Amino acid sequence: MKAAVWKKKKVLEVDDVPEPEAGPEDVKIKVEYTSICGSDPHIVDGTLPVSYPPRIMGHEMSGTVVELGKDANTKGLKVGDRVTGNPVRYCGVCDYCRNGQEHYCLKLAVFFPPGTMAEYVVWHEQQVFKLPDGISFEEGCLTEPVSVCLRGIDLSDVREGSTVAITGLGGIGQILTQFALLGGASRVMVADPVGSKRDLAMEMGADLAVDPAVEDLWAVGMKFTGNRGFDTVIEASGAEQAAKSAFDLVGKCGTLVYFAVYPMNFVLPMKPFDLYARELTVRGVFMSPYLFPRTLALLPKLKLKPLVSKIFPLDEVVQAFEEQKASQSIKILIKSQG
């Protein structure tokens, strides 16, 4: 079968690889779409050392069940089901798994399967979930990033009447904007230097969109909140300047969530006195724990189709990665079939 294989640092190629075989508890899936995660190009370039070549890339997937192992019978899955899945499998017995922190499972590295930018993938039944009726394959492959956004919102203390600022309007920022509004935020300000991304966020319901390249984000934010600062600030761009600016936007007793991958050597200047005097809460978001059931229930509430900027066939995956790095698109999909 064809697959997008990360061969070595900065080398991604479409290659012929053996078609995977399903074990007793596995589900074999014909992959329809994989969404490029913002972290994927950084992994290939070697600037995010969370995985190592050779490896099939991709983890945000939708597809169709084509085979079930003889013991894959606990979820009622059947051949022909439209599915998505969690790219990692949890052991269920380590301290993290038993404490609701499955995303830090001690066996993640052992259970991390091959990627989904391929014609077929085999995942353990535990990882596979049926898509809700009415959710397309194109929307369904965004389930994993939606689950991580749900984790971010859970940590962000957004509540009825909150003021929220979101910096960075890629797929994550656009989904977070919708979740903030669903969570009861009264006013949402967003920021991104790309005009089309700002326009889409306004269509999603944001109250104000700011271009941080030409406007003073702090001054605009203070005017927006009556000089109080925001109850919640979520930094989702990964830009170093945005990470610094976000700290100044948070109001007293507010929550700041860093929801992006930053360079490993980037040090954020922060005064502990400000944490004390303003009673701030600062959090990071890594991955989502067991949130897929909640996520799937929420998919019909979200506007996901407008987030898909472009679709590339699997044979053009290298071009798609270059497009992703240009930072002009929101979500780019790889079509595995046809």
Residue ranges of model-derived segments:
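Glycine-rich beta-strand-centered segment in the early N-terminal region that forms part
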Residues: 20-34, 47-95, 132-134
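NAD(P)H dinucleotide-binding glycine-rich loop of Rossmann-like/cofactor-binding domains
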Residues: 89-167
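Mid-domain Rossmann-like dinucleotide-binding core that forms the NAD(H)/NADP(H) cofactor-binding site
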Residues: 136-214
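C-terminal hydrophobic helical "lid"/dimerization subdomain
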Residues: 3, 215, 244-248, 289-338
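N-terminal glycine-rich cofactor-binding segment
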Residues: 3-21, 38-67, 84, 98-114
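Glycine-rich phosphate-binding loop and adjacent beta-alpha segment
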Residues: 203, 240-301, 336-338
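Short amphipathic alpha-helix with an adjacent loop that forms part of the alpha/beta core around
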Residues: 216-226
